C-alpha cells in the first residue's frame, strides 16, 4: 500500500509551512504530497493567514522537491475554466519533471462560492460541467502537437485551441476522481480516471464505493484492475495514548471517536486499520495531516507505519463487494 500525505491549507497555512510538510514527506518516503483546493476555512476557523492557491502552491513545490508526487484532492470544476486549468497543470507537470496528478470534483462548499463570487449551480449542472471539463482537458492533452482542438458543449465552447503546452507525462498526468455518489461519480471515474478516491468513509463505505466503481468499469468495457482505488482518512498517530490524545486535542478532535473516523491510535493500531482498508480494496491511502507544524508526527508514521504496509496489496476486484 502506498501512503500519501494530504493537507487542508484553507484551515490556515503559509506556503513555507506547506513546503516544510512536503519536504518532510519526501524525506520520509511517502509517495505524494496532496493538498485541498479550497478558499474558505471550514468549521468556524479563521483560516489565518488566509487561503493559498492550490496550483500556485504546487508550482512552487515542484521546484523545491525532487521525487515526491504532487496533486490536488480535489480541484473544483467550478473554480477554473477547463482550458486554462489544462495549461496550468501541464506547466506544473513540466516544472516538476512529470510528478503532477490532477484531482477533479464537482465542488460542494456553497458558502465558499458565495464568499468569493463564484457561481454555484445545482448538483446536476455541476456534474455536467465536470464532465465537460474532463472531456476538454483530456482532449487538449491528447491532441497531437501542431493540430488544434475544438469543442462544443452546453457550458463550454473552444474554437481552434492550439492544445499547448503538453504535459511531460505520457499519455497525460494521472487523473483522480473521488466522492461517494452512487451513479455519476463511478461512471466518470470509470471513463476518465486513473484513480478513484473515497474521502473520509467508513470501511463499509469504502467497500461499497469501490464495488460500485469497479462495476462501472465493467459497464464501459474497462478492466477494473486498471483503476487505482484509494481512501482518504484523518491521521492521528502517537507512541502511546497520551500522545494520541495530545495530537487529537491539537486538531480539535475527540480521541474517543477518532479511531472509528480515521487512522488514529498507536502505530500498530494505524497499521491494523490500513490492513482493513486494503482488504476493502484500497491500494493507496491519503493521510490527512491537520497540524502542519507537527513534523514529528510524519516522522513517526514514516518510521513505524510505512515499512509495515509498503508491501500490503489491495483485495482483488472479484473479492470486494
What annotation goes with each model-predicted range?
Residues 1-321:
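Active-site-adjacent structural elements that line small-molecule/cofactor binding pockets in enzymes
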